[in-house]
């Protein structure tokens, strides 16, 4: 990270951080994309099982990953103050937190998985596939969260190219392990859909080992000594949880509504489940663009606030949101004209492709609102503002969006489409509320004179 004084310099730095973030976000989303595509090509019933499993674990993964992501603004502001010792201490504490969260997630799954699946009244084979997938995936909980800590630390330093190369490595690892275990290649058992869970877990173990080597060898990471042993200091856990829990529950609230919609699709049959998952899965890939801009703005804004430069932070915010809207428009135009090709990636039957195309059409609307809402969430995290965005997320998705879907399902013949309309309503509301919150936060900084432009 470095100071900038002109718009051209800021745009250059924004893209210097953004492009690697975008590439590794695409690589990150590709893990579930690979699971979905490979499983769908194996058998439609296995795709339905993996889809249900994803609806169950995605909210918890994003909740815990959101808590860990609080490391980015914390380190970003410490970096702005040039506090290397503080950075080393807080990163190691986050590693303890990551392990603790992984153990908690495993225990929740152990206790609640069977009751949750039994309540859904799924076809027996779909339920079995979902259960086995999640049990095998749980082997990767600890490396997933520890890697998330390391990646967040690297990102906060502005070294997003390093994170990019690490995440790119995930793609061939995941493809190799998935292919081997789904189809039973290279002497390994043919596990079908559950093999994708084990393949992803194994890929993250390898990725964690590589990330630790990078921490020890990279010349810009070695000076921070983040792997130097530190005992747990519970007093240092206050800020990570004070900031991380609202961030985590904010993301959880958003992902949970999407997951709940996925679960509600169960009553419409396995083909609707599979088509819904296919459309949603590709939407997640498209979401990598605004999410990447969100992460880049968290890194930059937190650094500028640490430097006490509100004027520069505002300029980055303007550039970031404008970039997100332009990229989203171009992406959605391409998506609209390529719906048949995209649908064909996930399945082969004509009825499946036609239904998936309809779901993809609905996704175009909520992705446009995401292009504004996601960057604003990242900006607010850079300001260390997390509690109010969490409340606004609950209001937009659960108080406005979900009731709309339930009412439309009950009062009309829209069927599964009612819940896609609910997602659109929730994201539109969330977008508007977050815009108001950002304006309020910036106004407080300006009025109180807490941060001055240089």
Pin down the residues of each PLM region.
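Small-residue-rich hydrophobic transmembrane alpha-helices
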Residues: 47-110, 144-158, 162-163, 262, ...
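Residue-level hotspots within pore-lining transmembrane alpha-helices
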Residues: 23, 27, 31, 60-64, ...
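Transmembrane helical elements of multi-pass membrane transporters/channels
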Residues: 16-35, 136, 147, 203-207, ...
């Amino acid at each position: 990270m470095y100071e900038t004084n002109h718009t051209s310099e800021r745009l250059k730095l924004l893209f210097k951080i953004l492009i690697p973030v975008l590439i590794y976000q695409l690589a990150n989303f590709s893990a579930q994309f690979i699971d979905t595509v490979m499983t769908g090509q194996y058998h439609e019933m296995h795709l339905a099982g993996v889809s249900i499993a994803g609806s169950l674990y995605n909210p918890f993964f994003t909740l815990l990953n959101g808590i860990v992501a609080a490391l980015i603004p914390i380190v970003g502001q410490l970096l702005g103050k040039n506090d290397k010792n503080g950075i080393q201490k807080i990163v190691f504490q986050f590693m303890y937190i990551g392990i603790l969260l992984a153990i908690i997630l495993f225990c929740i799954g152990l206790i609640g998985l069977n009751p949750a699946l039994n309540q859904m009244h799924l076809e027996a084979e779909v339920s079995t596939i979902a259960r086995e997938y999640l049990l095998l995936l749980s082997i990767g909980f600890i490396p997933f969260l520890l890697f998330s800590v390391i990646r967040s630390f690297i990102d906060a330093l502005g070294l997003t190219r390093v994170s990019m190369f690490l995440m790119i490595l995930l793609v061939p690892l995941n493809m190799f392990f998935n292919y081997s275990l789904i189809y039973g290649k290279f002497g390994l058992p043919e596990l079908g859909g559950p093999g994708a869970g084990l393949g992803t877990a194994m890929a993250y173990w390898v990725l964690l080992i590589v990330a630790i080597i990078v921490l020890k060898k990279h010349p810009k990471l070695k000076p921070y000594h983040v792997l130097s042993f530190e005992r747990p200091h519970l007093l240092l856990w206050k800020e990570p949880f004070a900031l991380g829990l609202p961030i985590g529950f904010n993301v959880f609230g958003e992902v949970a509504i999407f997951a709940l919609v996925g679960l509600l699709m169960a009553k419409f049959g396995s083909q609707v489940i599979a088509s819904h998952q296919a459309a949603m899965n590709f939407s997640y890939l498209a979401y990598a663009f605004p999410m990447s801009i969100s992460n880049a703005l968290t890194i930059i804004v937190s650094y500028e606030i640490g430097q006490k430069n509100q004027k520069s932070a505002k300029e980055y915010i303007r550039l970031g949101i404008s970039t997100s809207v332009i990229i989203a428009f171009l992406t959605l135009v391409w998506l609209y004209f390529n719906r048949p090709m995209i649908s064909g990636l996930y399945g082969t039957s004509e009825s499946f492709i036609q239904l998936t195309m309809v779901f993809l059409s609905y996704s175009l609307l909520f992705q446009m609102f995401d292009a504004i809402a996601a960057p604003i969430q990242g900006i607010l995290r850079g300001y260390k503002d997390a509690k109010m965005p969490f409340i606004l997320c609950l209001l937009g998705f659960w108080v406005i969006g979900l009731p709309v879907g339930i009412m439309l399902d009950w009062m009309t013949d829209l069927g599964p489409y009612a819940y896609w309309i609910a997602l659109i309503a929730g994201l539109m509301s969330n977008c508007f509320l977050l815009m108001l919150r950002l304006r309020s936060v910036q106004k407080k900084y300006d009025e109180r004179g807490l941060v001055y432009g240089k």
